Amino acid sequence: MIQPQTRLKVADNTGAKEIMCIRVLGGSKRKFGNIGDVIVASVKSATPGGVVKKGEVVKAVIVRTKRGVRRADGSYIKFDENAAVVIKDDKQPRGTRIFGPIARELREKDKEFNKILSLAPEVL
């Protein structure tokens, strides 16, 4: 569950290291986001020479959460960290590489995230 003020690690090579959620997109009363949801975030720390700079407001898709997600067979998949991938307005990733595993639920949420899934080293 990602809500405003939650800090997430960035799982791509855009240059951002950590972002902070400003808003979960998808309705005015939306309080929490889970895997596959798009958020608006502020870059809190970044590497020099990256695509994004510190203080920049970006859109990102959540790819890993500590809370995890329940699957249809009753099992849960949880991760060690909250992580997101910085995306453009057309839902394509801004970076060229993705780090760490990505949950399969991302494919079921939106077909436009297939590029992120194809770049990921592992899909769980």
From Swiss-Prot:
Q: Sorted alphabetically, which SMART domains does this protein's record hold? A: Ribosomal_L14
Q: Name one GO biological process term.
A: translation
List GO terms (cellular component aspect).
Answer: cytosolic large ribosomal subunit
Which keywords label this protein?
Ribonucleoprotein, Ribosomal protein, RNA-binding, rRNA-binding
The annotated subunit structure for this chain is: Part of the 50S ribosomal subunit. Forms a cluster with proteins L3 and L19. In the 70S ribosome, L14 and L19 interact and together make contacts with the 16S rRNA in bridges B5 and B8.
What family does this chain come from, according to its entry? Belongs to the universal ribosomal protein uL14 family.
Function of this protein? Binds to 23S rRNA. Forms part of two intersubunit bridges in the 70S ribosome.
Query: From which source organism is this entry?
Result: Clostridium novyi (strain NT)
> Which molecular-function annotations from GO does this UniProt entry contain?
large ribosomal subunit rRNA binding; structural constituent of ribosome
Q: Does the keyword Glycoprotein apply?
A: no
Q: Does the keyword Metal-binding apply?
A: no
Superkingdom of the source species: Bacteria
Annotated protein name in UniProt? Large ribosomal subunit protein uL14
